[in-house]
Amino acid sequence: MLLTTLLLSIGELRSSNSTARHHPALQHKKAKRLFKRQGIVVPIVVDEHHRIIDGHLRFQIAQDLGIDALQAIVVSKATPAEVIELELALNRLAQDSNWDEARLKHK
């Protein structure tokens, strides 16, 4: 698997029809508010055909906000199975973590 980072125009990006995650309206609203204030600071991940592997919500909000381009990590020379594994793993990682309540009190 080969990884490169590019700035891709919104028009070059392709939304995947196979995304396994659903983003509720409240999550979309919160993320949009954050991205308006801070910008989209995490690159999306795409395959060599610029189909989104990870970052559908960021892509949707970029469209909503009229953002012209996004930083993207392009995954090439990956098998279809590797792409599916990457998509599922990236979407699952945060779900499997817990907050450290003691540390949150100091933030």
Predicted features by range, described:
Residues M1-K107:
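Short, charged/polar connector segments at secondary-structure boundaries
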